[in-house]
Structure formats: C-alpha cells, structure tokens
Amino acid sequence: MADKVRLGLIQLCGCSGCHISLLDLHEQLLDVLPNLEIVYAPIIADVKEIPECDVFLIEGGARNEHDEHLIHEIREKSKVVIAWGTCAVYGGIPGLGNLYSAEQLKKTVYGTETTDNVGELPSDEMVPPLTNSVMPVPSIVDVEYVIPGCPPRPEINAGAIVALLEGRDPELPKKIVCDECPRTKENVIPETFKRTFEGTPDPEKCLFEQGYTCVGMGTRAGCGALCPSAGVPCRGCYGKTDEVLDQGSSLANTYAAAGDEALKISDKSALFNRFTLPAALISKKQE
C-alpha cells in the first residue's frame, strides 16, 4: 500500500472496552500498524481538533449534546465511519437509561447524597447537557459499517481492519450464539424460569432448556459463546442478527412459547433489550 490509511478513534458514551479489545490483538497489531497512521485518538494522545480521516472508529453512542456534536463532525471529516462496539451500534448498557427521563436520571445520580456527592446538580459548564435519550451512532449519521460486540472480539477487530486495508467490506457472523454454543440442545420449552444464581446448571445441557434466561437464540454470533460455555446465560451483547428488525421483539416471541411462565420473568426490558434498547422499535419509555 502506497499511502497509509489515516485512522481516527474516539470513545463517547462507552467504557473504552473496544479500545482495549483492539490492544488485545497484541503482536498481530504489528502486521497492520505499518499501513495505518493514527491521527486522532484521545485515549492515546491529547489532540484538540479532529482532522480529515480515511477511517474513523466511534466507540459509544451519544448521551449528551457534546457527543452528538462530535459524531456530526466526525462524519463530515471522514470517508468511512464505523460504529464500533455495541454501545455505538445499538446504545449498549447505557441505553437502559432510556427507561427514564434525563431529569429523572440526573435527580437520582446527583440528587442522592453520598460521601463524595453533596446532592447538587452540576452546571452545564461542568457537564454537557444530556440528550433526551441515548442515541446509537447510526441514528445520528449514516455509517458505512457496524461492528457490534461488548466488546468485539480482537479477531473481529482484526478482520475488519484487514478487510478495509484490502479494499473489502468487513463481514459479520450470520449465525446466532446458539450455533457456537457446545451445550446439548433437545428443543424443549422450559416449564419455569430461574435466576442465574438459583441452583447449579447441568454443564452439558442447554441453559435455556434448563430454565435459565439465556438469549443466545436471538443474538448474533461472534463471541464464541464464551458465557454459556462458562455456565453463564448469554445476555445478548452482540445484538440482533440480520434476519430480524428488533432483538427484543424476537426474543419476546421465543419466550412466549413458555406461556404464563414467561410473564413472571422480572425486568423483561433489561433481559430482551439489555444492550439494544435505543435501537429497538420502541426505544424508550412511553409517557
């Protein structure tokens, strides 16, 4: 490659886990770094202005007006914009804040006195004004690609970067987590549902069929089914597959097969749309 690809990275309403996942490539980074020029990455260096970029990876969605402004500026200055990680693609865990108004959130967070919080709301000069809801990047600007995952596995990051360097479109897994899960499935509907801490699951059998609230059947593959393999139900962090419009609706339809028992599940919003509420068909609490 004659010219290096000018790469930008930023963390908005996210935890920097996607950046760490990129670093988790370790020595593999040495294969791609010669073809990249990192021109903007606040997590690495303090650069005041966003420069022109060939590719920009945005981690996190928008929770405040400053986030939204930066997303628009990045779009204007970048040839290729990638929503990087589930928070950017779907809203992620912060998106559960959409179940409450911005004022309710501020009152709870800053209005509850603690040992290091005097119960005063910060001014807009200290904290940028919150948007009415958490917004995924694709709901604000057009993006060329999305890379879901909380965080994306290092090999998915590597595959996307190599594809772009070679002039190809990055590809995402088409299957669901259940397809990667080694547990035995007998296609039975559980008679009742249990919390994760209740009982000890059979290490060989499907967690959902044992009554644990696993959502692997409605979640895009790519993680290698790490959680179910370790005895922890899938929580849906890779979001929906290409076959459905809404992860939560798809999962609710699956769980409905259990009849009234499914209605007894606590906090269904956080089960079915734990990582994807801002991108759901009903993306926030209806007044």
From Swiss-Prot:
It is an enzyme of class 1 (oxidoreductase). GO terms for molecular function: iron-sulfur cluster binding; oxidoreductase activity. InterPro entries: Hydrogenase_assoc-protein, NADH_UbQ_OxRdtase-like_20kDa, NiFe_Hase_small_N_sf. It comes from the Archaea. The keyword Methyltransferase does not apply. Keywords: Oxidoreductase. The keyword Translocase does not apply. It holds the Pfam family Oxidored_q6. Its EC number is 1.12.99.-. Belongs to the [NiFe]/[NiFeSe] hydrogenase small subunit family. NCBIfam families: F420_non_VhuG. The F420-non-reducing hydrogenase vhu is composed of four subunits; VhuA, VhuD, VhuG and VhuU. This is F420-non-reducing hydrogenase vhu subunit G. It comes from Methanococcus voltae. The lineage of its organism: Archaea, Methanobacteriati, Methanobacteriota, Methanomada group, Methanococci. The gene is vhuG.
